[in-house]
Structures are given as structure tokens and as C-alpha cells.
Amino acid sequence: MPELPEVEAARRAIEENCLGKKIKRVIIADDNKVIHGISPSDFQTSILGKTIISARRKGKNLWLELDSPPFPSFQFGMAGAIYIKGVAVTKYKRSAVKDSEEWPSKYSKFFVELDDGLELSFTDKRRFAKVRLLANPTSVSPISELGPDALLEPMTVDEFAESLAKKKITIKPLLLDQGYISGIGNWIADEVLYQARIHPLQTASSLSKEQCEALHTSIKEVIEKAVEVDADSSQFPSYWIFHNREKKPGKAFVDGKKIDFITAGGRTTAYVPELQKLYGKDAEKAAKVRPAKRGVKPKEDDGDGEEDEQETEKEDESAKSKKGQKPRGGRGKKPASKTKTEESDDDGDDSEAEEEVVKPKGRGTKPAIKRKSEEKATSQAGKKPKGRKS
């Protein structure tokens, strides 16, 4: 899912190409799962003729500041992306719409043409993004509930160490908590923990002063570098775990050291056991539960399925009310089943396959049944190889 660097790259592209220009044409998709709380026609009327003054971001959220409110706000979800026609903008790899596709893309949820002819589109292939029209985006959820932005509002080393000392949860889920620090997602959390040589399941309050300092430094350096290159992963340093974290178990190495995969905070997590070791009570606890974990580990998805949807929902303003939304919860289970059958394919093709399951709402039953049978067959056929992960 797009994280702080990808959203910041989109913000900068808008700032460089769209400021001071008037919106002369608007097309809003008729998709009430993505377009939140307003009809397409009302959305269009509200921003037509307005001038874009600035593009702002907090965490993984972006909004356009116009010459008068309300303002369009974008929560990128699993696969949201900003496109500006004729302008190169870095996108999360599973967000990318092919250049050969129609313009605006069939996945476009928000499209505007500016008075100089420039065209901007927000697309979402997976339909887990949220596009809102808000009078003051920072005063309402999800932005009002976010913690300090990891790039713009970093804690000092002392503040960071003091806050970690009060947290009795494991460090990886804490870093993913957008209410604690906003902008860090799964790949950044894995990267900064690897750089700081901290095990993802180490309890935050048990970290030494030196570890807190190392983690503070790695967060700063990883995010600043990713932003510096506009989130272009081909320019990330070769020693980053990022380049190998999606390879198959047993084939993933960084600097000659084996990468292993566990689940931390419900997320598939890449780490290097040789360098990131548990210690103290966490090590004792892990030794007791490790056999059980190994038994369920192959069932985890590849890090881009249901768990990303759950992270998006946690950031959503309806986090409390969603407990009663049974249809949405039901849809969340189907992509998870599908992902299990395709967990060995990590090249991004799973995005389009999942998209076919989500999109045709009226045809969900038969494909789901078919995928469950395929999952069972795949699971039975692959038990022994997966058992060798450890």
C-alpha cells in the first residue's frame, strides 16, 4: 500500500504542476465505496471553477487546498494513485495503471481538467481508498486522529525514547499505528527495524537507550532517502532489505544473510534473524510459542491482501462504526482466501486478480467457492515445501 514517500511524491507533483490553476472540468466516479459522504454531482459542483492553492499531506493522507472550502481529500488505501497527464509521478507498484490504457483510466475516481489543459486523476484499482470533500480536513477523522507526521513532525530522540518506554506492545505494530506516528507502513517498518537491528516482536518498552537512538535514526534516514528519490524504489540503497523482502522464503537474502518471514501485528514481516534477535522476556516467550507459530505461518498472506485492507480501515473515520458493517467484513474475507492461493506470486499480478473478485458485487459467490476449492488443493499440494520455511 502507498506509504508516506509515495504520497509525498504525489503531493510534490501537484505542487509543481497544478498550483494557481483553475478547475474547469470535473468527473467524479459513481462509486460510493470510494467517494465518501457526497454524491458525484454535488462533489463536482462544489469544486468546479475553484483554483488550486496548495497540496498538503499528513501521513498517508493528501488534500488539495482550493481558494475556498470545501477541499478534496484523499486516503490512498491499498492502491490509490495520483496521475497527471504527461507528468511522471511515482506510484506504488500495485497502483500502477498501464500507459497503454485509456485516459482517464477506467479506475479513475476523481478527475479534473485545469484551465491550461492539464489533467489530473486519482485512481484506485482495488477500491479501498476514500475520497472526501471536507471543509477542514485536519479537524475530522482520519487526519485529526493521526499522530505526528514521520517526516514533517519528528519527535526528538529523547521524546521518542520516553514514549517507547511507556509502550508495552511489540515494536512493529506500534510503528504501524498511525495514531502514534503517521506515514509508516509495512515496508518502512520492516526497513527501519532492520537498519536498527531490532526484532519486530521485541516489546517497545524493553528497548535500550541505544536501540531507541538507532531506531530514531533509521526512521529519519529511510524516510528522507525515500522522499529524496520521489519513492522510486530503483534508487533505494542496494543494502536495504526492501529489495528482497518479497522474494520467496528460502530465496530471500540481504548482504548474504537470510531473510525470514513472521507475522507481527497481523502483518507479514521480513527480518534477518542473524541480526535482529529477541532478548529478555520476549525471547523466553517466543521460545515457548514458536512451534505453534510455525504451524500457522504458511497461512499468512503476502502482505498485500486482507491485512492491507485492515490497515486502511484502521485509519478510516468509521473505525468504530465499521464493527457493525457485516457486508464489508464479508468482502474482506474473500480477498484473503484468494491471496492464500497466490501467496507465492509477489510480482504485483495479484492486484488485478483480486480486483476481479471485488468489482462484480453480484457475482461474488461462485468465484469465492471456486477459489476455496483451489486454495484447498494448493494447500495440500504445498504442505511439505512450506513446512521447510523455518
UniProtKB/Swiss-Prot annotation:
DNA binds at residues 107, 126, 167, 186. Expressed in leaves (at protein levels). It catalyses: Hydrolysis of DNA containing ring-opened 7-methylguanine residues, releasing 2,6-diamino-4-hydroxy-5-(N-methyl)formamidopyrimidine; 2'-deoxyribonucleotide-(2'-deoxyribose 5'-phosphate)-2'-deoxyribonucleotide-DNA = a 3'-end 2'-deoxyribonucleotide-(2,3-dehydro-2,3-deoxyribose 5'-phosphate)-DNA + a 5'-end 5'-phospho-2'-deoxyribonucleoside-DNA + H(+). Disruption phenotype: No visible phenotype under normal growth conditions or UV-A irradiation stress. Its main location: nucleus. CDD domains: PF_Nei_N. GO terms for molecular function: class I DNA-(apurinic or apyrimidinic site) endonuclease activity; damaged DNA binding; DNA N-glycosylase activity; oxidized purine nucleobase lesion DNA N-glycosylase activity; zinc ion binding. Residues 283-390 are annotated as: Disordered. It holds the Pfam family H2TH. SMART domains: Fapy_DNA_glyco, H2TH. Its EC number is 3.2.2.23, 4.2.99.18. InterPro entries: DNA_glyclase/AP_lyase_DNA-bd, Formamido-pyr_DNA_Glyclase, Fpg-like_C, FPG_cat, MutM-like_N-ter, Ribosomal_uS13-like_H2TH. Monomer. PANTHER family: FORMAMIDOPYRIMIDINE-DNA GLYCOSYLASE (PTHR22993:SF9). Involved in base excision repair of DNA damaged by oxidation or by mutagenic agents. Acts as a DNA glycosylase that recognizes and removes damaged bases. Can process efficiently 4,6-diamino-5-formamidopyrimidine (FapyA), 2,6-diamino-4- hydroxy-5-formamidopyrimidine (FapyG) and the further oxidation products of 8-oxoguanine (8-oxoG), such as guanidinohydantoin and spiroiminodihydantoin. Has marginal activity towards 8-oxoG. Has AP (apurinic/apyrimidinic) lyase activity. Belongs to the FPG family. This is Formamidopyrimidine-DNA glycosylase. It comes from Arabidopsis thaliana. The gene is FPG1.
